């Protein structure tokens, strides 16, 4: 992913998360950084999301296991309940889709094996933040 395109996608995702009531921050760092830092982290309630962000015109994106490891290492530094996510802006459909990662391995995120960001947020609010309400703006 081109750096400028990547930065733009990360900023867009942070903006969406903030509009849904998350505290969200983009971490501007290089993939070569030895520190276990996600592209974005977001919190709501006592839940911490570590997010690897991608943007593509293709129908799939591969995420190397070293990027997944960084998400889990980042989450392990905090006592909050953590979730590792891959968020992909599939530009052909003009939508964000996400995949929650539960184990360390190379991951392929496709249009078909991921869920729309708005659906993930809705499920997140229902399952983890029941008192937060369930109304979502259109993404």
Curated annotation (Swiss-Prot):
What parts of the sequence cross the membrane?
Answer: none
Example GO biological process: DNA recombination
| Top-tier EC class | hydrolase
| Residues where Mg(2+) binds | 10, 39, 52
Q: Which UniProt keywords apply?
A: DNA damage, DNA recombination, DNA repair, DNA-binding, Endonuclease, Hydrolase, Magnesium, Metal-binding, Nuclease
The source's domain of life comes to Archaea
**Catalytic reactions on record:** Endonucleolytic cleavage at a junction such as a reciprocal single-stranded crossover between two homologous DNA duplexes (Holliday junction)
Q: Which GO terms describe its molecular function?
A: DNA binding; endonuclease activity; metal ion binding
What are the EC numbers?
3.1.21.10
Needed cofactors = Mg(2+)
Q: What happens when the gene is disrupted?
A: Not essential, it can be disrupted. No change in sensitivity to mitomycin C. Double hjc-hje mutants cannot be made, double hje-pina mutants grow more slowly at 55 degrees Celsius (versus 65 or 75 degrees) and do not grow to the same cell density as wild-type.
Keyword Membrane present in the record's keywords: the answer is no
User: Site positions for Transition state stabilizer, renumbered to this chain?
Assistant: 54
The subunit structure is: Homodimer.
Please state which protein family the record places this protein in. Answer: Belongs to the Holliday junction resolvase Hjc family. Hje subfamily.
Q: What else is known?
A: A second Holliday junction resolving enzyme, Hjc, probbly with different substrate specificity, exists in this organism.
What task does this protein carry out? Answer: A structure-specific endonuclease that resolves Holliday junction (HJ) intermediates during genetic recombination. Acts only on 4-way DNA junctions in a sequence non-specific manner; introduces paired nicks in opposing strands 2 bases 3' of the point of strand exchange only on continuous strands of 4-way junction DNA. Cleaves both mobile and immobile junctions.
Name of the protein = Crossover junction endodeoxyribonuclease Hje
The gene from which this protein is expressed is hje
């Amino acid at each position: 992913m081109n750096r400028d395109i990547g930065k733009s996608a990360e900023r867009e995702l942070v903006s969406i998360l903030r509009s849904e009531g998350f505290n969200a921050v983009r971490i501007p760092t290089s993939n070569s950084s030895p520190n276990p830092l996600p592209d974005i982290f977001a919190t709501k309630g006592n839940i911490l999301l570590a997010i690897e962000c991608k943007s593509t015109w293709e129908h799939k994106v591969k995420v190397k296991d070293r990027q997944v490891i960084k998400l889990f290492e980042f989450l392990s530094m905090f006592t909050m309940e953590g979730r590792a996510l891959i968020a992909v802006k599939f530009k052909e459909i003009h939508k964000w889709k996400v995949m929650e990662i539960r184990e360390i391995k190379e991951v392929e995120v496709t249009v078909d094996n991921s869920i729309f960001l708005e659906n993930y947020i809705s499920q997140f609010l229902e399952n983890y933040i029941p008192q937060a309400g369930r109304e979502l703006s259109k993404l």
